[in-house]
Amino acid sequence: MEKPNMRNYYAIKVVGGQEINVALMLEERIKTNNIKGIYAIIVPPNLKGYVVLEAEGLHIVKPLIAGIRNARGLAQGLLPRDEILKIVSRKTVGPTVKPGDVVEVISGPFRGTQAQVIRVEEAKGEVVLNILESAFPLQVTVPLDQIKVSKR
């Protein structure tokens, strides 16, 4: 059920692994042909084989994808807006820690050791730890999902 002059989300089937290439070709075609009515090209990181277009209608999307290499056609129906928001929203991974917290490493080569948080790199999803049980200062970087907070 397409709504006129509304932003709808269309899933384009794509050859697996070619999502970025198809998105770039779509962008180039939109720019060179000065196509109006396309608002976004979304390449979902966890949805292989699809590129999502935010557009006014099917009458704009179908001619746009015609002849694009590695584009296999449109998926049936529209994607709901809340599904798109789930796909593109950033998810927090692991516990929330601050520098100075004492944590326990729960997996990896340092499993079971106590450590103090030196620095949190949220963009990478990692923390830099100072291992407390070593004889000399030993700093290691581990993913956030490999630690558990012991003391704050």
Curated annotation (Swiss-Prot):
SMART domains: KOW, NGN
One record GO biological process: regulation of DNA-templated transcription
Listed Gene3D superfamilies: 2.30.30.30, NusG, N-terminal domain
KOW domain sequence ranges: 99-128
GO terms assigned for molecular function: structural constituent of ribosome; translation elongation factor activity
InterPro entries: KOW, NGN-domain, NGN-like_dom, NGN_dom_sf, Rib_uL2_dom2, Ribosomal_uL24_CS, Spt5_arc, Translation_prot_SH3-like_sf
GO cellular component, one term: ribosome
Disulfides per UniProt: none
Keywords linked to the UniProt accession: Transcription, Transcription regulation
SUBUNIT field: Heterodimer composed of Spt4 and Spt5. Interacts with RNA polymerase (RNAP).
Function: Stimulates transcription elongation.
Family named by the database record: Belongs to the archaeal Spt5 family.
Protein name: Transcription elongation factor Spt5
Organism: Saccharolobus solfataricus (strain ATCC 35092 / DSM 1617 / JCM 11322 / P2)
Gene label: spt5
